[in-house]
UniProtKB/Swiss-Prot annotation:
NCBIfam families: matE (TIGR00797). This is Multidrug resistance protein MdtK. It comes from Escherichia coli O139:H28 (strain E24377A / ETEC). Belongs to the multi antimicrobial extrusion (MATE) (TC 2.A.66.1) family. MdtK subfamily. One of its GO terms (biological process) is xenobiotic transmembrane transport. It is found in: Cell inner membrane. Multidrug efflux pump that functions probably as a Na(+)/drug antiporter. The chain crosses the membrane at residues 11-31, 53-73, 93-113, 127-147, 160-180, 189-209, 243-263, 276-296, 314-334, 350-370, 387-407, 418-438. InterPro entries: MATE_fam, MATE_MdtK, MdtK-like, Multidrug-R_MdtK. One of its GO terms (molecular function) is xenobiotic transmembrane transporter activity. Its main location: membrane.
């Protein structure tokens, strides 16, 4: 028992700054939604639709770069710090290439939005404008993630926390300026949220680079000599590790994003209620997601040290702490769901729908916690392909079809509207949690030699 208590302390020491950083990041979305909602319900719905396309695209790049964290943690644990700088430099090259692709996709996303059935033309125009403003922040966001992954792989999670709050503090006044048109700036409404967020991502990246250049603990990494040219072999390995993570994130996020697109023809009330419930549940999700990042660091570091038993301890401790956190957040969500909805919008119909959907969100929080921490554990073991297969099966084969049938057809019951999709979320996330745990048990029962050989790749 003592080893689990000690490991829990180490995990929380890593996870708490990550939690705070993620809260700051998610709070930026909260601020965008609230401030756009204060301008008009149409602008809030436009931000919701635009975000439903932005998130799958940018999180694909984010997932690709997550391969850096276990790679750096394993190199750090095995005492091979001299190899870290080269990995980071290749991460920046990879981020640059991916950001160009993402920007092209987002620029042309208007075709998707305007092809939605029965979508209001004014709503579509605002959503397209929001995306075309936001896409200029894609390189800044991905470059920031490379720098952050470097710090977190070295078990330094506080810098990401500090930069997250800097971003949040900058986002609020810049939102105000561009949404309402102050200090000589144009009044852009929801599009102003995109302008503000793009600017904030570049501020966060530049602030993180400034920290890394001054950090004494990273002097040996920073001082590596040589020209930062693309290294195809290293980039190929990062892609091999990161692509399954990216696709897994893509499949998970598109479960939510596609639902937002399917809900949009149902009307502004349904879109707004769904967005409020989804935005708040995302705020609660930062707890297990941040703990998963800490577990990845600890598992990768322990495997770098050659200790498979300590890696198991880190994994099990992370799961126990995550379930406890999820239970508390579920109770909080159920108890205060109506008051939470009122923070976003005072339309009675929107508040009623959002409060109802939050009940369903509370149901899946425990299984969601298990599946995301399970994914973090598998990343630590560098077993990323299994994450891809599990998420595809859980979200696209089980979750989304189930939600569609319940929400929009009468094959099982009368069409349930947004609530049917949320039941689909429960089915998908619970299935993912079960499969993640089965895969983890399989890996941990392999001979130590094989586990360490896989981790050192």
């Amino acid at each position: 028992m003592q080893k689990y208590i000690s490991e829990a302390r180490l995990l929380l020491a890593l996870a708490i700054p990550v939690i705070l950083a993620q809260i700051a990041q998610t709070a930026m979305g909260f601020v965008d939604t609230v401030m756009a909602g204060g301008y008009s319900a149409t602008d809030m719905a436009a931000v919701a639709i635009g975000t439903s396309i932005w998130l799958p695209a940018i999180l694909f790049g984010h997932g690709l770069l997550l391969a850096l964290t276990p790679v750096i943690a394993q190199l750090n644990g095995s005492g091979r710090r001299e190899r870290i700088a080269h990995q980071v430099r290749q991460g920046f090259w990879l981020a640059g290439f991916v950001s160009v692709l993402i920007m092209l996709v987002l620029w042309n996303a208007g075709y998707i939005i305007r092809s939605m059935e029965n979508i209001d033309p004014a709503l579509a125009d605002k959503a397209v404008g929001y995306l075309r403003a936001l896409l200029w922040g894609a390189p800044g966001y991905l470059f920031f993630q490379v720098a952050r992954n470097q710090c977190e792989g070295l078990a330094k999670t506080k810098p990401g926390m500090v930069m997250g709050f800097i971003g949040l503090l900058v986002n609020i006044p810049v939102n105000y300026i561009f949404i309402y048109g102050h200090f000589g700036m144009p009044e852009l409404g929801g599009v102003g949220c995109g302008v503000a967020t793009a600017a904030v991502y570049w501020v966060m990246f530049l602030a993180m680079v400034s920290y890394i250049k001054r950090a004494r603990s990273m002097r040996d990494i920073r001082n590596e000599k040589g020209t930062a040219k693309p290294d195809p072999a290293v980039m190929k390995r990062l892609i091999q590790l990161g692509l399954p993570i990216a696709l897994a994130l893509f499949f998970e996020v598109t479960l939510f994003a596609v639902v937002a697109l399917l809900v949009s023809p149902l009307g502004i009330v349904d879109v707004a209620g769904h967005q409020i419930a989804l935005n708040f549940s995302s705020l609660m999700f930062v707890l297990p997601m941040s703990l998963a990042a800490a577990v990845t660091i600890r598992v990768g570091y322990r495997l770098g040290q050659g200790s498979t038993l300590d890696a198991q301890t880190a994994a099990r401790t992370g799961l126990m702490v995550g379930v406890c956190m999820a239970t508390l957040t579920a109770i909080f969500t159920v108890s205060l769901r109506e008051q939470i909805a009122l923070l976003y919008n005072d339309n009675p119909e929107v508040v009623t729908l959002a409060a109802h959907l939050m009940l369903l969100a509370a149901v899946y929080q425990i299984s969601d916690s298990i599946q995301v921490i399970g994914s973090g554990i598998l990343r630590g073991y560098k077993d990323t392909r299994s994450i891809f297969y599990i998420t595809f099966t859980a979200y696209w084969v089980l979750g989304l079809p189930s939600g569609y049938i319940l929400a929009l057809t009468d094959l099982v019951v009368e069409p349930m509207g947004p609530a049917g999709f949320w039941i689909g979320f429960i089915i998908g996330l619970t299935s993912a949690a079960i499969m993640m745990m089965l895969r983890m048990r399989f890996l941990q029962r392999l001979p130590s030699v094989i586990i360490l050989q896989r981790a050192s790749r």
